[in-house]
Amino acid sequence: MGQKVNPKVFRLQINSNTWDSVWCATDDYKQKLHQDLFIRSYINESFKHAGISKVTVERTVTLVSVIIHSSKPGVIIGKKGLDVEKIKQKIAKKVESSVEVNVVGVKKSEIDAVLISRSITHQLEKRISCRRAMKKAIQNCLKMGAEGIKVSCSGRLGGAEIARTEWYKEGRLPLHTLRANIDYAFCEAKTICGIIGVKVWVYVGS
């Protein structure tokens, strides 16, 4: 059977925006990697309903810069930027260097693969039918100007005893064309019957 390679990893040389961590290290690589993982998990857990698409960590010798891409930037910033200050203080304790936090708004959340996958998982956890959730996501995505989309759900769908995979695809999705800008995301929905995996591919354009 043919397997699907992660489209982001496949295009690392071409799409430089795919890197989540922009830094290099020698001896303390392990320590910095664990710091990055902590930063991402802390931000994602603290702002579950802020529509966070991506958390990028950039480092210099003296500064750690955290860029949060969100569809609801106001939720993260808070009143007079108080929530951002809390994030800075929490990260600074772990990193032990000066921290800068920037919040960037995501203009079209309907085209963002991460936000689509999270939206579907929330619906599945609320016991909404996977077919209905997938069709709605595809409809909204194509309305906002995407050239193609594929959504896949795997697991005990609808509480069935035997796990299966269901998927829907609309428009063009050239996975083998390297210049094609394809966004990909994977998310897990924790339901009563077990975990359901949700995969989303979005073809934005070349």
From Swiss-Prot:
Xref: InterPro entries: KH_dom-like_a/b, KH_dom_type_2, KH_sf_prok-type, Ribosomal_S3_C_sf, Ribosomal_uS3_bac-typ, Ribosomal_uS3_C, Ribosomal_uS3_CS
GO cellular component, one term: cytosolic small ribosomal subunit
Gene Ontology biological process terms from the UniProt entry: translation
Keyword line: Ribonucleoprotein, Ribosomal protein, RNA-binding, rRNA-binding
Cystine residue pairs: none
PROSITE patterns per record: KH_TYPE_2, RIBOSOMAL_S3
Keyword Transport on entry: no
GO molecular function, one term: mRNA binding
Stretches assigned to the KH type-2 domain: 39-107
HAMAP family: Ribosomal_uS3_B
PANTHER family hit by this protein: 30S/40S RIBOSOMAL PROTEIN S3, SMALL RIBOSOMAL SUBUNIT PROTEIN US3C
Family of this protein: Belongs to the universal ribosomal protein uS3 family.
Subunit composition and interactions: Part of the 30S ribosomal subunit. Forms a tight complex with proteins S10 and S14.
Function per UniProt: Binds the lower part of the 30S subunit head. Binds mRNA in the 70S ribosome, positioning it for translation.
Protein name, per record: Small ribosomal subunit protein uS3
